Amino acid sequence: MLKQFLCVISLLAALPGSALAQNASEIARVQAGQSCPGCNLFQADLSYLDLPHIDVSGARLRQADLSLATMNHANFARANLSVSNLFGARFTGASFAYADLSRATAAGAYFGSADFTGARLDGANLSGAEMETARGLTQAQLNTACGDASTLLPPGLRIPPCR
């Protein structure tokens, strides 16, 4: 029994790191301004960076820090941005089509003309976010998120307050 246990432990130790862990080389690529569709950017620090037109579509950006970054015209389509920090970031013309922004914090972020078609916003904090010219937003999406009186939305849409 002990021999089998040690054999299993040896096999597990020989396997590469978890597929869910960060990929430092892919994170470094994006930090240098290179597109990286489908990359594993889990917990990446992209704060304060200027990354216009970057393509991280389908990437795993869960728990990433994009605070105060400028990512105008970036492609986040189908990316996982759940539990990410987007505080004060600029995303003019960016695509978040079918992206997962569940429980993301986007307080004070600017989303001028950004596309939110089919995006998941469950539990997202959009307090003070500027989304007045955002496209593809629906009331159903916003009903699952929260904001405050300073959240700017397209005409006819509203958002429940954060608690």
Regions found by a protein language model. Give the residues of each.
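Bacterial N-terminal signal peptides
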Residues: L6-P16
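Positively charged n-region of N-terminal signal peptides that target proteins for export
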Residues: M1-Q4
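Tandem repeat scaffolds
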Residues: A21-R163
